[in-house]
Amino acid sequence: MKIAIIGTGISGLTCGYYLHQQHDITLFEANDYIGGHTATVDVRVGNEDYAIDTGFIVYNDRTYPNFIKMMNEIGVEGIPTQMSFSVRNDGNGLEYNGHTLTTLFAQKRNWLNPKFYRFILEILRFNKLAKASATEQISSSQTLGAFLDEHQFSDFFSDNYILPMGAAIWSSSLADMRAFPLMFFLRFFLNHGLLDVMNRPQWYVIKGGSRAYIPSLTQGFADKIRLNSPVEKVVRSEQGVAIYANGQCEWFDEVIFACHSDQALAMLSDASSCENDILSNMAYQANDVVLHTDTSVLPKRKSAWASWNYLLEGGEEGLQRLPSLTYNMNILQHIDSSHTFCVTLNRTEDIDENKILRQFTYHHPVFTMESIAAQQRKEEIQGAQHTWFCGAYWYNGFHEDGVRSALDVVKGVAAKHNEKSDTLYEQGAA
């Protein structure tokens, strides 16, 4: 079959990898590069060259089974890394890093602060309660904020721990995290070991930067990728699909939208009511991302520096603003340098412009009650009118989810044409 794949992020490349041997595929990419959020940047600082990841950075051995299986198949290695989380609250002066007991008390006065000990006890209480609740039947309309209120967690705990951690994971504001679907939140935290003090998954980075897997993954179909080829519109008929790109029209038997949900909907000139209802309820949000060497956005105490560092302002404005998060790439990628390489979201105005190396805008899926409901309706549109949809937005929004959703499509295409696909999936927590 002739299959068009629109988008070359992890979902599109996974489809290409598993489909190219049996089918005549063509991948359309609007940009002049492939990889989507797999974006490693080469920079030269102080007469030294560095390769810094700015999008997809880490994966773990517990909840990325399909991604790991694919990396093993193409011979790409991972390097163990440290996963730690810090909070700096400029509204109340709090700083901590939850990695070890020493870093937890990086702010020495907290050893004598009863409020901080109550804070630690609340973390343990939340973990225990969340574990129990995650296995129960929870209403699809219940929110994280309602759960916190119902069980009388303090604002100090919510605003300095669980809301910033969730906001860091899903690139949401603190206010949006209060409205976050509770069951989605609890199951994710449970599966990723975030409700355990011990027994957490081992995290990894790709050796040589995340882009290192792309040449090996695309080796068999690199000549099928068309860069600088934004798809203008897609028109379906009973016979197949017409793809309009670069002023030309080309016919295919099937089309796979391996792009964001809103992008797919915009390309469909004849979207069905189901496609419109489902895809329009899975929105994306833009986040400003800066690669730089300005450590002023990290905790003031170096002992509190973590892999992920959340900066809070306090007050109503702080609740509403997009997450202010900095990845310390020296820790994550084991970079040995006198310069500290940071990747910061949504804090561009506070970064010394003389220390900015690159700037980007990345779009991340927004998870709401409506989007979770839309996820459950995927089968209503999957495969209809010769059309398939994949992307991380169908699950939790991460790299494994992009792979998993692509495998759903590959399996669906195979089933439609009586081909074998049973060996594609690995078992793992969602």
Predicted regions and their residues:
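N-terminal Rossmann-like FAD-binding beta1-loop-alpha1 element of flavoenzymes
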Residues: 2-27
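Conserved Rossmann-like nucleotide-cofactor binding loop
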Residues: 11, 33, 262
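Glycine-rich FAD pyrophosphate-binding loop
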Residues: 20-44
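N-terminal glycine-rich dinucleotide-binding loop that anchors FAD/FMN and/or NAD(P) in oxidoreductases
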Residues: 41-67
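Mobile amphipathic helical/loop "lid" adjacent to a hydrophobic cofactor/ligand pocket
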Residues: 61-182
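Conserved flavin/dinucleotide-binding core of flavoenzymes
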Residues: 99, 319-430
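Helical element adjacent to the flavin cofactor pocket in flavoenzyme catalytic cores
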Residues: 185-243
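Mid-domain catalytic core of redox enzymes
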Residues: 230-363
